[in-house]
Structure formats: structure tokens, C-alpha cells
Amino acid sequence: IAGLLDHAGELFDCSAAEETTLEANPDDLTPEYLAALRRAGIDRLSIGVQSFDDACLKLMNRRHDAAQALQAVRSAQAEGYGNITVDLIFGVPGFGGDSLRRTLDTALGLNVQHISAYHLTIEPDTAFGRRAARGEFAPVNEAVSEAEYALVHETLTGAGFEHYEVSNFALPGFRARHNASYWHGAKYLGIGPAAHSFDGRERHWNVSSVEDYLAGAAAETETLTDRDRFNEYVMTRLRTAEGIGLAETE
């Protein structure tokens, strides 16, 4: 990771970079790895906790358990990370109500600066999706989804977090800078297999195969019309607390 960041600094002017985020699973964040990441220049961690309920984690086939998730956050804080976000999942069949409330309370008790809460999506061609197709569990209905989303919103905003985007909550001053760029139509460069980029007019996405990517396979490209860009502006900005600026649509 240090080599990648150093090479990026050789190719691009990164002097204005205000935040360098790394996403990781809890079971990967050993004290040694956390220290190495700090030395490499990582100053923000996004930790894929998903839940602090072991039964819920088992249902979702996660490698880690709740104890590992807690330890990952505490180890990161001990290493000096002062900008940590945890990803949580709601809408998991059988794990709303008290289970979700305990997960939210546990996350708040860790004094992290940012929390992302996403509704579970069951993809058909996954192990989880195949289990649902066999009738092992059923997706939650719309009423349950709404109730759980309301619980997430009320709990986190009640604790002082800003609900600044559909799925994202931050303490003042800790909004995710890279995500905000996507929602506001900024340009970005994606490097690696399956990575997406946007140059202001065209979207590019790399092949997903590592072998094909290393062999130099060309990225696919979509050129956006003015109508496409307007529609994307509306859709992405409606995800944010700021909403749409009418002057910007003219």
C-alpha cells in the first residue's frame, strides 16, 4: 500500500489530498498491520463491521465475529486513528428490533466519527441469494425496512450525528470526502480490476478479471449526454441533505 501511494504521488499532484481512506475487514486489522498503514499514510479507516450480533454475522457468512469487530476498532484507536467509520447492515431477516438497536448502541459506544448504514441487498447469484431462493429465509418487507431505517436515523441523529446522505452519518467535521465527491459529480480515477472512473463527461470501467487487466485489456466507456448528466445530478444530489440547487440545474 505504501508503494502504491508513493507511486501515485509520483504520477499525480496529491499535495491537496485531505484524506486517505482504506477499507478493511475487522479480522485483517492486526496491531502490526494498523501501524504499517499509518506509516504508509492512511489516516482514515472504513471498517466493515456489518453487525455486532454474532448470529447475524453468521447468517451473512462474515469471517469475523463481534469480538473481532470490537477489537479492530479499539486497536485502530490505540494506534492513533482519529477518523474511523464503521459499516453496518440493516434489513437482515430476523435481526431488526433489539438486535439492530444493540448494534447501533455498541457502535456509538466505540466513539467512532462516522457510521454508514446500508440496507441488505440479496443478490441472486451469491451463496446468500441461493439460500434465500431455497426458502431458508425471506427478505424483510417494506414496512420492516422503513421501521429499521427510522430506528437507524433516530438513534444516530439523537447521538449528534449528521444524516448527510441516505446511508451516511457523521459527527460534525467528519463527512467522508471521497464519497461526497461522487455525489457532487466530481472527477475521480479508479485504478485496478473492475474500478470505475469519471472525467466529467465520460465514465470508464476496467475489466473485472485480474489476468485481463494485467494484460492491458481496454476499459469500457460510456459518453454521457447533457441529459444523462442532468439526470445523474438529480439522482445523486437527492441522496444528500443539501438536495438540489435549482440555480445549478439551469
Tell where the protein language model's regions lie, with residue ranges:
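C-terminal scaffold of the Radical SAM
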Residues: 1-250
